């Protein structure tokens, strides 16, 4: 999965897809009551990027629904995963449950259309810190109460704050979640980062019987050398400001026969086992 990073303006969706992304990450900004208002990152953000691009969240969902709905004039088959970077650290953790309710409701109304010609992409809920776990409860409770638990099959969970992997597992156990789990590791492109935690996550992913990590990706990679380093470790995905650079690295002799771009036919919740 090549994940376009910080794709917060509607016009950026096709821009990043044209550069080779098959997944996009966008930031969800909440008001003080946990209502999802805008796709917006804000200052500071990655070096060399404009931090202030934004859209109304529901309008953004309406657009990506069209882009991921077969038969729609705007359909792009390559877009298979939407990663919602939930800026919950900006609101009280007491509002995390309400935020989960609101995001689930808006996805039902504007993306899935409650079963009427909705978008098909998989959804990854990027949660900054384990203390915000109530978001997941609010989200799942809403799907159940609204009679649309079928969409759980399309939804995954990812804690993105580089916290202790065993602490993340404990929270997932507490929630009763042991599938559809991704693990991110990374830092803003402005700073270097080693691979210790990334390698630990990959080791857990590859441990037979370990349920709490099915995919691992590294973020935010801008240098080709760091992309190569991550690919050599066998990551499942790379988040980048420059998807075209990732495409270029994947075409190199070392990687061309080892990796391919994920398509809609690839289940993002299953571990990929090399033969």
UniProtKB/Swiss-Prot annotation:
Catalyzed chemical reaction(s): an N-(acyl)-sphingosylphosphocholine = an N-(acyl)-sphingosyl-1,3-cyclic phosphate + choline; an N-(acyl)-sphingosylphosphoethanolamine = an N-(acyl)-sphingosyl-1,3-cyclic phosphate + ethanolamine; a 1-acyl-sn-glycero-3-phosphocholine = a 1-acyl-sn-glycero-2,3-cyclic phosphate + choline; a 1-acyl-sn-glycero-3-phosphoethanolamine = a 1-acyl-sn-glycero-2,3-cyclic phosphate + ethanolamine
- Which cysteine residues pair off into disulfide bonds? 45-51, 47-190
Known EC number(s)? 4.6.1.-
User: Does the record bear Transmembrane helix in its keywords?
Assistant: no
Q: Cofactor stoichiometry and binding?
A: Binds 1 Mg(2+) ion per subunit.
GO terms, biological process: killing of cells of another organism; lipid catabolic process
Function description:
Dermonecrotic toxins cleave the phosphodiester linkage between the phosphate and headgroup of certain phospholipids (sphingolipid and lysolipid substrates), forming an alcohol (often choline) and a cyclic phosphate. This toxin acts on sphingomyelin (SM). It may also act on ceramide phosphoethanolamine (CPE), lysophosphatidylcholine (LPC) and lysophosphatidylethanolamine (LPE), but not on lysophosphatidylserine (LPS), and lysophosphatidylglycerol (LPG). It acts by transphosphatidylation, releasing exclusively cyclic phosphate products as second products.
Q: Which family does it belong to?
A: Belongs to the arthropod phospholipase D family. Class II subfamily.
State the protein's name: Dermonecrotic toxin SpaSicTox-betaIIA3
Which organism is the protein's source?
Answer: Sicarius patagonicus (Six-eyed sand spider)
Q: What is the lineage of its organism?
A: Eukaryota, Metazoa, Ecdysozoa, Arthropoda, Chelicerata
């Amino acid at each position: 999965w090549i994940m376009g990073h910080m794709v917060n303006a509607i016009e950026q969706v096709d821009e990043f897809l044209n550069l080779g992304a098959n997944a996009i990450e966008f930031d969800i900004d909440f008001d003080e009551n946990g209502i999802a208002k805008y796709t917006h990152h804000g200052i500071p953000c990655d070096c060399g990027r404009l931090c202030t691009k934004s859209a109304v969240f529901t309008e953004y969902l309406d657009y990506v629904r069209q882009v991921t709905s077969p038969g729609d004039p705007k359909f792009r088959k390559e877009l298979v995963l939407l990663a919602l970077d939930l800026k919950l650290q900006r609101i009280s953790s007491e509002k995390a449950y309400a935020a989960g309710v609101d995001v689930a409701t808006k996805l039902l109304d504007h993306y899935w259309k409650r079963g009427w010609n909705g978008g098909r992409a998989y959804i990854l809920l990027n949660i900054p810190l384990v203390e915000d776990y109530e978001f997941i409860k609010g989200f799942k409770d809403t799907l159940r109460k609204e009679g649309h638990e079928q969409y759980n099959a399309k939804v995954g969970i990812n804690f993105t704050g580089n916290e202790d992997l065993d602490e993340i597992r404990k929270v997932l156990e507490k929630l009763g979640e042991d599938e559809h789990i991704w693990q991110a590791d990374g830092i803003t492109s402005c700073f270097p980062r080693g691979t210790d935690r990334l390698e630990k996550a990959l080791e857990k992913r590859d441990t037979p019987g370990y349920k709490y990590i099915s995919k691992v990706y590294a973020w935010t990679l801008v240098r080709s050398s760091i992309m190569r380093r991550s690919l050599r470790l066998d990551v499942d995905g790379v988040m980048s400001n420059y998807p075209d650079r990732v495409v270029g690295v994947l075409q190199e002799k070392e990687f061309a026969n080892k990796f391919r771009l994920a398509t809609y036919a690839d289940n993002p919740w299953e571990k990929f086992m090399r033969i």
